[in-house]
Curated annotation (Swiss-Prot):
Alphabetized InterPro entries for the sequence: Methyltransf_16 (IPR019410), SAM-dependent_MTases_sf (IPR029063)
Annotated S-adenosyl-L-methionine binding sites: 90, 140-142, 162, 217, 247
Coiled-coil positions: none
Record lineage: Eukaryota, Fungi, Dikarya, Ascomycota, Saccharomycotina
Keywords, ordered alphabetically: Methyltransferase, S-adenosyl-L-methionine, Transferase
Described purpose of this protein according to its UniProt entry: S-adenosyl-L-methionine-dependent protein-lysine N-methyltransferase that methylates 60S ribosomal protein L1.
GO cellular component term, pick one: protein-containing complex
GO molecular function terms noted in the UniProt entry: S-adenosylmethionine-dependent methyltransferase activity
Keyword Transcription in record: no
Family of the protein in this entry: Belongs to the class I-like SAM-binding methyltransferase superfamily. RKM5 family.
Record EC number: 2.1.1.-
Superkingdom of source: Eukaryota
Protein name as annotated: Ribosomal lysine N-methyltransferase 5
GO terms of biological process kind: methylation
């Protein structure tokens, strides 16, 4: 079962030491790579399934996603302002998706409830993530569209965001994998889908509002909400709870400041509209210095409450998930 370890300006260093020591002890059983699933092919299949395949009960317990990768863009110095990491599939997102949907340890996040605060003799109440009253907002989606076409089955709204140069391939991949959204009727202005849905259709499956929007962390500003994208503004006006998801976006020191500024702005927006907002940030553990700097900036400079999700499945992997 998962628990939350709140980090402060002192305990973060103990946490970093212990987590990277554990990572080193597991090195023999873990892949030693940067985390790209396969940079040699232009089309890749990602399967998301049960941890115990013998418990598979229906087609709803398995997802197979076909992803187009513009691998020539990964090595280009002229596309997307030379920011090219989003053009391939990274392993953090499939790992997180499988853990969240299928593992019993993640049920507290799926269904909500009280989760143990480690070393505090206390608990924190989490709202359910899997509910039609919940919206998911993904930062740094990349081109794959894995989270929208899987987690979209369990929520009322999903907004996938990235820099504008990424969005065309992201939209293509989502459209080609709509069959994975087998629990929902999808409506979307950005994808031009089912803008007029009749009531008889909604009797069979519930509605998912799914949008792909540009969101540049360095330019994101909430001072004038009338300038925000209408779909993003509607998310904050209409949903009781929003979970922000950001998978493998912390991989160098240059992105940390603008990312945390964006999280801070989103939290301010949530406060304005009385929305319960939590952020789940998945990190592949590469540079100890980058992970430390991220935690220092979040906890010390931005004075954010940062929790480490302590979980045996996560700790036997190369990934850490933090909640802000």
């Amino acid at each position: 079962m998962s628990g939350l370890l709140q980090l402060d300006e002192e305990s973060l260093y103990d946490h970093i030491f212990e987590r990277y020591t554990l990572l080193t002890s597991n090195n023999d059983s873990l892949k030693q790579d940067l985390g790209i699933v396969d940079r040699t092919v232009s089309k890749i299949t990602i399967d998301i399934d049960q941890f115990d395949f013998n418990n598979k009960k229906s087609n709803n317990d398995f997802y197979s996603i076909e992803i187009n990768q513009p691998i020539t863009s990964l090595n280009s110095s002229s596309v997307n302002n030379n920011s090219t990491t989003g053009y391939v599939v990274w392993s953090t997102t499939p790992f997180f998706t499988r853990w969240l949907i299928f593992h019993s340890n993640a049920s507290i996040f799926r269904n909500g409830g009280s989760i143990e605060l480690i070393d505090q003799d206390d608990e924190l109440k989490l709202p359910p993530m899997f509910s039609n009253s919940v919206g998911l907002l993904e930062l740094g989606s990349g081109i794959a569209g894995i989270l929208p076409v899987t987690l979209g089955n369990f929520v009322g709204s999903f907004i996938a965001t990235d820099q504008i140069g990424i969005l065309s391939t992201l939209k293509t991949n989502i459209l080609e994998n709509l069959s994975q959204l087998n629990r929902k009727i999808v409506t979307s202005r950005s994808l031009n889908l089912n803008l007029d849905v009749d009531e008889s259709t909604l009797l069979k499956r519930s509605l998912l509002s799914l949008e792909c929007l540009p969101l540049d962390w360095e330019l994101f500003d909430i001072k004038d909400t009338t300038k925000l994208d209408p779909a993003l503004l509607s998310l904050f006006k209409e949903k009781e709870t929003i979970y922000v998801l950001a998978m493998d976006v912390i991989y160098n020191e240059y992105l940390i400041e603008s990312f945390l500024s964006t999280i801070q702005n989103l939290k301010s927006l949530a406060f304005k509209f009385n929305v319960n907002l939590n952020c789940l940030i998945g990190i592949q553990l590469r540079s100890e210095e980058v992970t430390t700097l991220f935690l220092e900036k979040a906890i010390i400079d931005y004075e954010m409450k940062v929790y480490y999700i302590q979980d045996n499945i996560l700790e036997s992997s190369r990934f850490s998930i933090y909640m802000i």
